[in-house]
């Protein structure tokens, strides 16, 4: 299991300061919509300058018509990030288009499909999709697997179910991780490290418990020790 730290702070200075404090660790860093829209490609370069071995997960959740998604995926692949994501609900054709486009690169990034956002609870989800989170997450994951993607973004609770219907090597990345039982915040389906391990999760994304800590490096050290 690998750790991905969310760079979700209000300014580029704070995010870079956090990255610098973690430069000695073999970790992934997640750059989301807010940070990328505000700070752009330059921010990605600055992260790599701090530690060229940092792995970057660009969390933009592409969702559009197939050709537009493929065009955007090609531009992302040119950025040199190691992983990015798209929405599975865009459909299998869109997912296949993305994979065909990124596979042209010598070192293509990993591509993950978002199944069900961890901010949904069951009631909210049913009101939109008229189905359970588990059923829909499995359906989206199966389609992503068949489309040739590398894995999915899901909650801890769907991770092992998804591997059972796809492959043990099909990546599951889970947000909403509260390593040692911290407050859930705006996430609904959260879990700790032990449950993530039990459910065969490959990547855990941790944000607030790290960047709101007095000593983020200490928290990262503790998490890595428990992986």
Swiss-Prot record:
Catalytic activities: orotidine 5'-phosphate + H(+) = UMP + CO2
Pathway in which this enzyme or protein is active: Pyrimidine metabolism; UMP biosynthesis via de novo pathway; UMP from orotate: step 2/2
GO MF annotations, alphabetized: orotidine-5'-phosphate decarboxylase activity
Enzyme kind, highest EC tier: lyase
Signal peptide per UniProt: none
InterPro entries hit by this protein: Aldolase_TIM (IPR013785), OMPdecase (IPR014732), OMPdecase_AS (IPR018089), OMPdecase_bac (IPR047596), OMPdeCOase_dom (IPR001754), RibuloseP-bd_barrel (IPR011060)
Cysteines paired by S-S bonds: none
SUPFAM superfamilies, A to Z: Ribulose-phoshate binding barrel (SSF51366)
Residues annotated as binding substrate: 8, 30, 59-68, 118, 178, 187, 207-208
Domain of life: Bacteria
Matching Pfam families: OMPdecase
GO cellular component: cytosol
Catalytic residues in the record: 61 (proton donor)
GO biological process: 'de novo' pyrimidine nucleobase biosynthetic process; 'de novo' UMP biosynthetic process
Listed EC numbers: 4.1.1.23
Gene3D superfamilies registered for this protein in UniProt: Aldolase class I (3.20.20.70)
Keyword terms, alphabetized: Decarboxylase, Lyase, Pyrimidine biosynthesis
Record HAMAP family: OMPdecase_type1_B
Function comment: Catalyzes the decarboxylation of orotidine 5'-monophosphate (OMP) to uridine 5'-monophosphate (UMP).
Record PANTHER family: OROTIDINE 5'-PHOSPHATE DECARBOXYLASE
Family according to the record: Belongs to the OMP decarboxylase family. Type 1 subfamily.
Quaternary structure, from the entry: Homodimer.
Name of the protein in its database record: Orotidine 5'-phosphate decarboxylase
Organism name: Nitratiruptor sp. (strain SB155-2)
Gene for this chain: pyrF
């Amino acid at each position: 299991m690998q750790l991905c730290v969310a760079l979700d702070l209000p300014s580029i200075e704070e995010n870079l300061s956090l990255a610098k404090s973690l430069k000695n660790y073999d970790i992934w860093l997640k750059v989301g919509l807010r940070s990328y829209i505000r700070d752009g490609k330059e921010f990605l370069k600055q992260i790599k300058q701090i530690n060229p071995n940092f792995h970057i997960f660009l969390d933009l959740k592409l969702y559009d018509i197939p050709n537009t998604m493929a065009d955007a995926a090609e531009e992302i692949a040119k950025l040199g990030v190691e992983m990015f994501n798209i929405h599975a609900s865009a459909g299998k054709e869109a997912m296949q288009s993305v994979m065909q486009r990124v596979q042209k690169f010598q070192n293509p990034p990993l591509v993950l499909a978002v199944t069900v956002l961890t901010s949904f609870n069951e009631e909210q989800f049913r009101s939109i999709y008229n189905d359970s989170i588990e059923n829909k997450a499995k359906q989206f994951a199966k389609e992503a697997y068949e489309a040739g993607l590398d894995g999915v973004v899901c909650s801890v609770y769907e991770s092992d179910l998804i591997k059972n219907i796809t492959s043990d090597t099909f990546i599951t990345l889970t947000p909403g991780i509260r390593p040692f039982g911290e407050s859930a915040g705006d996430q609904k389906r959260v879990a700790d490290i032990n449950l993530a391990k039990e459910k065969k999760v490959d990547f855990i994304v941790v944000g607030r418990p790290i960047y709101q800590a007095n000593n983020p490096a200490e928290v990262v050290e503790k998490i890595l020790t428990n992986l």
